[in-house]
């Protein structure tokens, strides 16, 4: 048996805000202000980590938070992700398997984004490691062109985030 230390967070991708390099901080701060305003009834922490924001709810209101964020200008995509500060490959394998076991479908694809370039395992290698682990331990098959389930893995400076849309 293994113990997985992961928590649910809201991953926010912001799009066009970062194309205006000179005004980047202004737009990001404006987006943050809008998020705080929309979520004024919730308790949460927010992490701004270059091209992403992560909202860590202090209660179980993650679904309500996602709904509130839907119409904020500047947000490109919102996902519920599972995060862990343990970025060891064994933990990522266990997290990925646990998350995949919650999905229905027959095929999958792993997509890794390694913004932490100091991380020793490259993105394609991580795709293969995690994909192999899922293949061995579930009935899922790989389909890189049209999978039923995408499993996204983001390896950042201080944590790993895993989500499917």
Where are the model-predicted features located?
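RNA-binding accessory domains that recognize and position tRNA/RNA substrates
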Residues: 3-165
